[in-house]
C-alpha cells in the first residue's frame, strides 16, 4: 500500500470499473429494495442539497445491495420547463436570435439539441460522488415512454371530470408570460412603503382610511372590509364608499379576515389581484375586476388615463393623483415580503387567467387515508402533520404553463371553442366523429413540470405497461427528499400512485433537513456562501473560488462584500478532501432537524479519519502475510484483547443495522467513527503490538491476533462501505487474499451480521478497566509534562485480591502502554512521597513526582501558560461586557465567545491545581 491515501488517484478509476462491470444493476432473488432518485433538473449542476440527499440514498442502496436484497436505485432527470426554456432562449439571444423568430417546432429542435449536448452535467457530477444508480435504466421526463404515461393520465382524468379548464387566480410572471407554482415564487423582505388612502363615504362627510403597499390595485377594488366587532366602523357596514380616482362606488363589508390592529383597521378588497381578497370576494359574492394584462400593463377595465401604463408607472401616477385630490392621508416606510419569480426576479402578480386544473379533493382523500392508516410512514414522524395540514386544505392544482418546452396539453379546439381531449388529433377526430374539413387547433400550453414528476415512481418502471420491473419494484421502498417539496411532489406522487396503480408509491418517506452554512444561513448566490460539493472533493484555489462566487453578480458592492468574506474564510482556497470525507460529513450531519449547518472543519476531520483508516490498514497488512496468518492447520489462540475487539465489533454491527433501519445516519456515522478511531485504532492496534513484538509469545497467540486484525479490518471496511465507498474498496481489494472473499468488489460482498458467539461482557468489563487505568496514567504523564519515553514507577493503594489478580493478568500490557518500570502495592497506611494520584474505582494509582520533572522549568512554563489564559479570559470578558458586541453580534457568535471564556476558565483552574502540586514537591 502507498504510504499516504490519495483519493484523486483512485476514485475515478474505481467508479469506471463499477459502472462498466454493471455492479449497480439489480441482481439475485433476495428481498426487493427500490429508491427513486428525485429527478434533478436537466439544466442543473450538483449543489450541496443534492450531494447530501444523494449520499443518503447511495448509502441505503449500497447497504441493501450488501444485505443481498435485489436493489434498484432508479435514476433520471426532469425536463424542467421554465429553466430549460430560459437557458436555450439566452443561448439564442447571444447569437442574436429571439425565440419568437422561430416556429415552435424549430425552437423545440434547438432545446433537444441542447439537451443532448449539455444536459448530462449533473449525471457526470453524480458519478464523482459515487452514486451507484443503475445508469442502464436512466429516464427523462420527456422520453417517449414517460410522455405516453403523461398523456394517458391527462386523458383519463379529463374523461372522469377530474381535469377541467377554468378561470382562477394564479401566480403570474409578467416577464416570462406564464403561470408559476408557489415553489417558483421567492418572498424576501424588502423596503417599501405603506400608503394610507382616503375612501369617502357616499352621502357623508366621513371617510375610511385604507393602508396598502400596492396602490395601483385600487383600480380593481370591489369593497372595503372591516372587522365585524370593530365598534369604530360598525355603523358603516352596508354603506357605499367612493373608489378614489374611479367613477364607481364599492360597499363596506364585515369580515373576520380583517386585523383590527393593523393600519387603520380597514382593508381594501381586490378579488382579482390578491389571494386572500379572492377568498373574501367569494364569501361576499363580490365581482372580480381584472385590471392587468398578461404583460403587467393596465387594461381597459381601468379609467382611460391609466390604460396601457406599466403597473409600476401607474403606481407613481396614482400616488400623484391621490395627492392632488387630497385623498392620500400619509406615506410611511414599511418592510414587506415581496413575491418575486425565482427565474425572472420580477414581482409576481396574482392574476385571473384561463388555465387547466386538476380537481384534487377526490384524489387527496385516499392519499390522506394512506398516511393515517400507516401504509406510508414519514420519518421523522412530525412531518405527517405538515402533510395533513396541506392536504386537508388542498386547492385545485393549476397544471398549465404558457411555455413551449414541456408536455403539450393533449386538447384540441374547433372554431366554436369546443374542447376535445385525446391522444392525438386523429384520436380526437375518430372518437368525436369530426371530419377533416373541420379545422382543429391544439392547445398552445404545456403541463406543469410537477405533473410528470408526480408519475415518476411508476412511469419510470414502465407503466402503463405491466412490466416485470413494475411488478418487482413497485411500490418502492423509501423516498428521500426535503421538507420543502412535501406538498409539491410527495403528496402528488401519493395521489397519482393510488389513483393509477391502486397502490402507494413508497412505504416510507425520509425527510432531510436543508443544508445551510456554518452559521445557519441559507446558501445563496447573493449571500456569496454557496459551496460546490466538487470543489470540496477536488479542491479549488482562492481566485477561482472568488470568480465562481461573484460571476453574474450585477452590483459591485455585493461583489466586493463576497470577495472580502471569501478571502477571510478561505485564504488558501479549499483543499481537496476527496469524496469519502465529504460523504461521511453529510451522513454525520443527517440529524432529525429542519436545518443542517455545514462546516468545512468537519470535512477536514473526516479526511483525517480516512488517513487514520489507511494507516491502520497499512499496519495490519505489514503485520500480516499468508505464512504468519496460516489459515491452514495452525492452531489459533485469541488474547483477551482479541476477544474484546471482537465483542465490541458485535455491539457496533448491531447499532449500525439499527441506525440504518431508523434512518439515523448521524448516529450511524458517529458509531462507526468511535469504533474505528478509538476502539480499533487507538486501543486494539496498540494492544496487538506487545503480542506481535514478543518473541516469547505463543505462535498460536500471534496467529489469533493476526487473524483478528484482518477479520475486524474486513468487517470495518464493509460496515463503512455504504458511507465511504472508494477508500473501503481500495483497501478491501488488498485484504481479500487473507479472507477467502471472491474479491470482485466490496459492494457485492456480504454486509456484517452480529455473531452472538463473540459477545463477551466479562472480557469487555476487564478491558474497559484496563483502558481506564492506562488512560489515567497517561493523563498524569501529560499533566505533569513527564517525557513519554521515561519509564516511571507505579504505586497502587487499596488493592483487592481480585484486582491484584487482574493486574497480574494484564501486567505486560499495562507496563508497555503506560511506560511503567515497576508496580508496587502499598499497605493502607503506608506513606509515599508527593505523588500525582488517579482514583480508579476503589483503588488509587500514584506516581511519585520527585526526580521526574524539572521543578523550576515546569513552574516557569506554567506561569507563561497562565499569563496567556488570563489575557484570553480578559479579552472574552471585555467583549461579553460590551453592549456594542452583545446587542449587535449574531447569537451564534456570542455563544462561541461564551464557550471560549468557559473553556479558558476550566483550563486555568486545572493549571492552578497542577502548579500547587509542583510547588509542594
Curated annotation (Swiss-Prot):
Q: InterPro entries given for it?
A: aa-tRNA-synth_I_CS, aa-tRNA-synth_Ia, Anticodon_Ia_Val, M/V/L/I-tRNA-synth_anticd-bd, Rossmann-like_a/b/a_fold, tRNA-bd_arm, tRNAsynth_Ia_anticodon-bd, Val-tRNA_synth_C_sf
Question: What GO terms are given for molecular function?
Answer: aminoacyl-tRNA deacylase activity; ATP binding; valine-tRNA ligase activity
Q: How are the domains described in the entry?
A: ValRS has two distinct active sites: one for aminoacylation and one for editing. The misactivated threonine is translocated from the active site to the editing site.
- Subunit: Monomer.
Give the protein's recorded name. Valine--tRNA ligase
Where this protein primarily resides, as one coarse class? cytoplasm
Which residues does ATP bind?
525
Taxonomic classification, please?
Bacteria, Pseudomonadati, Pseudomonadota, Gammaproteobacteria, Legionellales
Sorted alphabetically, the Gene Ontology cellular component annotations on this record are: cytosol
Q: Where is this motif: 'KMSKS' region?
A: 522-526
Entry-linked CDD domains: Anticodon_Ia_Val, ValRS_core
Annotated motif 'HIGH' region: location in the chain?
40-50
Q: Where in the cell is it found?
A: Cytoplasm
Broad class of enzyme this protein falls into: ligase
Coiled-coil features, chain-numbered ranges: 849-921
- A single GO BP annotation from the record? valyl-tRNA aminoacylation
**The protein's Enzyme Commission number:** 6.1.1.9
Recorded family membership: Belongs to the class-I aminoacyl-tRNA synthetase family. ValS type 1 subfamily.
Reaction equations catalysed? tRNA(Val) + L-valine + ATP = L-valyl-tRNA(Val) + AMP + diphosphate
User: What HAMAP family would the database entry show?
Assistant: Val_tRNA_synth_type1
Which keywords fit this entry according to its UniProt record?
Answer: Aminoacyl-tRNA synthetase, ATP-binding, Coiled coil, Cytoplasm, Ligase, Nucleotide-binding, Protein biosynthesis
Amino acid at each position: 500500500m502507498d504510504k499516504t491515501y490519495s483519493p484523486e488517484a483512485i476514485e475515478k478509476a474505481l467508479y469506471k470499473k463499477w459502472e462498466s462491470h454493471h455492479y449497480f444493476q439489480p441482481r439475485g432473488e433476495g428481498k426487493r429494495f427500490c429508491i427513486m432518485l428525485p429527478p434533478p433538473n436537466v439544466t442543473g449542476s450538483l449543489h450541496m442539497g443534492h450531494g447530501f440527499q444523494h449520499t443518503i440514498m447511495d448509502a441505503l442502496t449500497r447497504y441493501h445491495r450488501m444485505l443481498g436484497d435485489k436493489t434498484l436505485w432508479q435514476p433520471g432527470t426532469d425536463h424542467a420547463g421554465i429553466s430549460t426554456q430560459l437557458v436555450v432562449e439566452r443561448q439564442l439571444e447571444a447569437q442574436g436570435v429571439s425565440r419568437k423568430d422561430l416556429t415552435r417546432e424549430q425552437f423545440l429542435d434547438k432545446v433537444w439539441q441542447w439537451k443532448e449536448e449539455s444536459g448530462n452535467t449533473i449525471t457526470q457530477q453524480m458519478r464523482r460522488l459515487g452514486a451507484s444508480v443503475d445508469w442502464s435504466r436512466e429516464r427523462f421526463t420527456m422520453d417517449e415512454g414517460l410522455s405516453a404515461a403523461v398523456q394517458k393520465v391527462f386523458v383519463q382524468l379529463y374523461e372522469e371530470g377530474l381535469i377541467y379548464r377554468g378561470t382562477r387566480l394564479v401566480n403570474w410572471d409578467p416577464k416570462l408570460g406564464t403561470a408559476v407554482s408557489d415553489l417558483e415564487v421567492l418572498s424576501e423582505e424588502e423596503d417599501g412603503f405603506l400608503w394610507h388612502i382616503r375612501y369617502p363615504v357616499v352621502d357623508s362627510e366621513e371617510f375610511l382610511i385604507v393602508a396598502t403597499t400596492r396602490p395601483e390595485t385600487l383600480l380593481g377594488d370591489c369593497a372595503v372590509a372591516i372587522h365585524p366587532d370593530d365598534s369604530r366602523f360598525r355603523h358603516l357596514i352596508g354603506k357605499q364608499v367612493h373608489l378614489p380616482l374611479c367613477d364607481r362606488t364599492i360597499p363596506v363589508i364585515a369580515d373576520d379576515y380583517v386585523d383590527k390592529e393593523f393600519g387603520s383597521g380597514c382593508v381594501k378588497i381586490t378579488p382579482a389581484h390578491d389571494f386572500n381578497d379572492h377568498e373574501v370576494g367569494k364569501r361576499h359574492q363580490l365581482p372580480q375586476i381584472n385590471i392587468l394584462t398578461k404583460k403587467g400593463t393596465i387594461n381597459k377595465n381601468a379609467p382611460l388615463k391609466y390604460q396601457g401604463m406599466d403597473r409600476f408607472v401607474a403606481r407613481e401616477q396614482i400616488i400623484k393623483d391621490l395627492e392632488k385630490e387630497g385623498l392620500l392621508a400619509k406615506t410611511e416606510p414599511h418592510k414587506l415580503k415581496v413575491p418575486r419569480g425565482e427565474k425572472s426576479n420580477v414581482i409576481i402578480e396574482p392574476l385571473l387567467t384561463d388555465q387547466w386544473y386538476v380537481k384534487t379533493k377526490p384524489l387527496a382523500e385516499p392519499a390522506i387515508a394512506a398516511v393515517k392508516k400507516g401504509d406510508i410512514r414519514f420519518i421523522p414522524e412530525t412531518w405527517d402533520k405538515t402533510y395533513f395540514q396541506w392536504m386537508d386544505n388542498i386547492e385545485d392544482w393549476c397544471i398549465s404553463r404558457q411555455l413551449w418546452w414541456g408536455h403539450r396539453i393533449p386538447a384540441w379546439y374547433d372554431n366554436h371553442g369546443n374542447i376535445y381531449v385525446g391522444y392525438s388529433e386523429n384520436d380526437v377526430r375518430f372518437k368525436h366523429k369530426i371530419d377533416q374539413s373541420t379545422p382543429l387547433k391544439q392547445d398552445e400550453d404545456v403541463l406543469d413540470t410537477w405533473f410528470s414528476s408526480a408519475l415518476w415512481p411508476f412511469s419510470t418502471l414502465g407503466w402503463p405497461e405491466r412490466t416485470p420491473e413494475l411488478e418487482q419494484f413497485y411500490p418502492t421502498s423509501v423516498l428521500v427528499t426535503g421538507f420543502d417539496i412535501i406538498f409539491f411532489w410527495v403528496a402528488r406522487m401519493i395521489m397519482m400512485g393510488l389513483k393509477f396503480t391502486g397502490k402507494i408509491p413508497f412505504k416510507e418517506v425520509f425527510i432531510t433537513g436543508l443544508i445551510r452554512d456554518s452559521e445557519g444561513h441559507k446558501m445563496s448566490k447573493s449571500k456569496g456562501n454557496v459551496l460546490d460539493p466538487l470543489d470540496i472533493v477536488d479542491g479549488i484555489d482562492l481566485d477561482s473560488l472568488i470568480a465562481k462566487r461573484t460571476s453574474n453578480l450585477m452590483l459591485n458592492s455585493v461583489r466586493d462584500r463576497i470577495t472580502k468574506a471569501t478571502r477571510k474564510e478561505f485564504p488558501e482556497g479549499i483543499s481537496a478532501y476527496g469524496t469519502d470525507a465529504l460523504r461521511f460529513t453529510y451522513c454525520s450531519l443527517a440529524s432529525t432537524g429542519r436545518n443542517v449547518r455545514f462546516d468545512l472543519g468537519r470535512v477536514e476531520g473526516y479526511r483525517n479519519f480516512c488517513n487514520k483508516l489507511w494507516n491502520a490498514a497499512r499496519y495490519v497488512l505489514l503485520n500480516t502475510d499468508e505464512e504468519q496468518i496460516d489459515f491452514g492447520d495452525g492452531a489459533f489462540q485469541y488474547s483477551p484483547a482479541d476477544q474484546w475487539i471482537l465483542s465490541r465489533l458485535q455491539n457496533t454491527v448491531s447499532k449500525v443495522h439499527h441506525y440504518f433501519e431508523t434512518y439515523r445516519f448521524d448516529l450511524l456515522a458517529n458509531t462507526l467513527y468511535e469504533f474505528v478511531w478509538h476502539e480499533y485504532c487507538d486501543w486494539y492496534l496498540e494492544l496487538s503490538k506487545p503480542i506481535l513484538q514478543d518473541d516469547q509469545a505463543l505462535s498460536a497467540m500471534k496467529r489469533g491476533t493476526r487473524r483478528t486484525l484482518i477479520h475486524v479490518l474486513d468487517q470495518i471496511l464493509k460496515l463503512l462501505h455504504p458511507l465511504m465507498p472508494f477508500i473501503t474498496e481500495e483497501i478491501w481489494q488488498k485484504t481479500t487474499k487473507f479472507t477467502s472473499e471472491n474479491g470482485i468488489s466490496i459492494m457485492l460482498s456480504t454486509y456484517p451480521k452480529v455473531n452472538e458467539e463473540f459477545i463477551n461482557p466479562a472480557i469487555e468489563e476487564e478491558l474497559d478497566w484496563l483502558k481506564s487505568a492506562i488512560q489515567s496514567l497517561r493523563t498524569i504523564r501529560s499533566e505533569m509534562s513527564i517525557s513519554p519515553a521515561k519509564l516511571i514507577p507505579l504505586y497502587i493503594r487499596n488493592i483487592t485480591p481480585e484486582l491484584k489478580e487482574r493486574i497480574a493478568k494484564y501486567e505486560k500490557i499495562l507496563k508497555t502502554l503506560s511506560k511503567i518500570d515497576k508496580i508496587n502495592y502499598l499497605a493502607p497506611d503506608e506513606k509515599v512521597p508527593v505523588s500525582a494520584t488517579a482514583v480508579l474505582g476503589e483503588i488509587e494509582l500514584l506516581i511519585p513526582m520527585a526526580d521526574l520533572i524539572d521543578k523550576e522549568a515546569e513552574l516557569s512554563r506554567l506561569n507563561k501558560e497562565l499569563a496567556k489564559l488570563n489575557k484570553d479570559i480578559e479579552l472574552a470578558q471585555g467583549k461579553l461586557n460590551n453592549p456594542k458586541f452583545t446587542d449587535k453580534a449574531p447569537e451564534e457568535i456570542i455563544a462561541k465567545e461564551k464557550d471560549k471564556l468557559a473553556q479558558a476558565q476550566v483550563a486555568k483552574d486545572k493549571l492552578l491545581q497542577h502548579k500547587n502540586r509542583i510547588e509542594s514537591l
